[in-house]
């Protein structure tokens, strides 16, 4: 993958990233003030895609910027295709619901599926398409995002003000 300790900025060209493990494009150690990295601080980072054609196939998160992921057309309209994990949403089936209620004077219904079997796997990997701890900001672009978990994820704010998303 691509990792920028301060930041990652793509403003044109064609970028193809494929990883079997880890994030496709990542930045996690930068504080940005007035469009420049002013100080490298642990746990901070910006990924800015301002143009170009970007294709990411990642074993974990597709694009991850701790502080922000910014997608804008300040250079040219970007085209972005991201596949995180297998690209197929992770779903699970329910275990059945409650049975019906008995009529007047009847008995309460029984659980529709009384098999309390459970299969659980613990996997700490994050398989999100575009992720930030603070801000995902989409102003423009053509985005095609497929992921096992959230396509767009932020612990604080996801902002859309343009773009075509599939």
Question: What do the predicted segments below correspond to?
Answer:
Residues 1-166:
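A composition-driven surface/loop motif
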């Amino acid at each position: 993958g691509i990792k920028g300790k301060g930041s990652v900025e793509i403003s044109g060209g064609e970028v193809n990233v494929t990883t079997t493990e880890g994030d496709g494009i990542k930045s996690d150690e930068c504080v940005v003030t007035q469009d420049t990295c002013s100080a490298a601080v642990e746990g901070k980072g910006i990924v800015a895609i301002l143009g170009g054609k970007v294709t990411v196939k990642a074993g974990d998160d597709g694009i991850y910027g701790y502080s922000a992921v910014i997608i804008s057309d300040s250079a040219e309209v970007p085209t972005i295709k991201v596949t995180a994990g297998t690209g197929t949403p992770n779903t699970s089936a329910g275990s059945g619901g409650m049975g019906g209620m008995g009529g007047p004077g009847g008995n309460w219904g029984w659980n529709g599926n009384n098999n309390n079997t459970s299969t659980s796997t613990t996997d700490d990997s994050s398989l999100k398409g575009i992720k930030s701890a603070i801000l995902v900001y989409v102003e423009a672009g053509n985005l095609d995002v497929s992921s096992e978990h959230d396509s767009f994820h932020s612990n604080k704010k996801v902002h859309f003000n343009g773009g075509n998303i599939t």
